[in-house]
A protein has these predicted regions:
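Short strand-connecting beta-turns/loops that link adjacent beta-strands
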Residues: 38, 81-83, 201-204, 259
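Hydrophobic alpha-helical segments that form the core
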Residues: 255-264
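Short, surface-exposed alpha-helical segments at coil->helix boundaries
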Residues: 3-7, 58, 232-236
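ATP-binding pocket architecture of kinase catalytic cores
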Residues: 20-143
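ATP/Mg2+ or Mg2+-diphosphate-binding catalytic cores
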Residues: 265-293
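Short beta-strand segments
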Residues: 43-44, 77, 187-190, 208-209, ...
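Active-site Asp-x-Gly
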Residues: 186-187, 193-252
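An alpha-helical support segment within catalytic cores of ATP-dependent transferases
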Residues: 2-18, 92, 109-114, 122-190, ...
Length: 293
């Protein structure tokens, strides 16, 4: 979206709000994001999916904020009458990106694993019935994955060498088994990318943002993005602290889901004929597969 147009929307709806600096951090698929004076974050849904979920997200965040303390989440204080966009006081800290993870000592990693596990335990303990009104029914992702598989299987396999084709066959077999299993479903964030997790200056968990993709699903879903740190030990520590009785299962399922997410992105790159993305996700799949196999 045009930044001038977005700023004009803010001025029109909140004439008393003044600022000197604007930072555009619109690096996601669903929202344009502007930060004013490094104090207030404004999010503007930029597609039908995000727009349909925005109003519910505002209500959800108000409902769960106290339940998740001391971890901070966005609290929208700037909302126009039609609730088509909104602003909140910035969640202070720095995003838990891969380069930040690599700088942490083993002691800090262990402490952070405990904090993330405790956050997930608290989040997942919120009864689905209490938040269901804030969650729209997702489209059939598994059904869509199967459609892409049928249509682009040959194209996908052509990108892999013989050794990796064998690994791909094993993966699809494992995925099929996991998808047939029955698991208790819980309230999940469903998008715990590094950019959505914030640490304070002492490297403790400070806040979590962007609940756009919230869902009722397998708890292992919230462990998927943790594999991006390329450290199985870190995921294992979190899953063990989260639930020592189900730790191995959650560890395994989340890794299978992580691989599936990578293949999903490869399918989309094939469909849109994006050569660089196809190669990038191929390398990511190979690296992710070797983490535990």
């Amino acid at each position: 979206m045009n930044q001038k147009l977005l700023l004009q929307k803010i001025k029109t709806n909140f004439p008393k709000l003044k600022w000197k600096t604007v930072k555009d951090v619109s690096n996601g698929y669903d929202h344009s994001v502007l930060i004013l004076d490094n104090k207030v974050v404004f999010r503007f849904p930029k597609n039908p999916y995000a727009r349909s979920r925005f109003k519910g997200e505002v209500g959800l965040l108000n409902f769960i904020a106290n339940k998740l303390k001391p971890i901070l989440i966005p609290h929208y204080t700037y909302l126009p009458a039609d609730k088509t966009f909104g602003g909140y006081k910035i969640v202070e800290g720095y995003p838990f990106i891969i380069s930040s993870y690599k700088k942490l000592s083993n002691q800090h990693k262990r402490k952070l694993a405990v904090e993330i596990a405790e956050f997930l335990s608290t989040l997942h303990s919120i009864k689905p019935a209490l938040v269901s009104k804030y969650i729209l029914k997702d489209y059939a992702r598994t059904k869509e994955f199967k459609r892409l598989y049928r249509r682009y299987k040959k194209s996908l396999y052509s990108l892999f060498n013989q050794t990796d084709q064998s690994r791909l066959e094993i993966f699809f077999g494992d995925l099929s088994k996991v998808l047939k299993e029955k698991h208790d479903k819980v309230f999940v964030h469903n998008d715990l990318f590094a950019d959505n997790i914030f640490l304070n200056k002492n490297n403790h968990l400070k806040g979590v943002i962007d609940f756009t993709d919230r869902a009722i699903d397998d708890p292992a879903v919230d462990f998927i993005r943790l594999w991006n740190y390329n450290d199985p030990g870190f995921v294992a520590m979190i899953s063990q602290r989260y639930n020592k009785f189900q730790a191995k299962d959650i560890f395994y399922r989340s890794h299978i889901y992580f691989l599936a997410d990578t293949i999903w992105n490869m399918f989309n790159a094939i469909e849109k004929n994006k050569e660089k993305e196809k190669k990038w996700f191929y390398r990511k799949f190979k690296k992710a597969y070797k983490l535990i196999f």
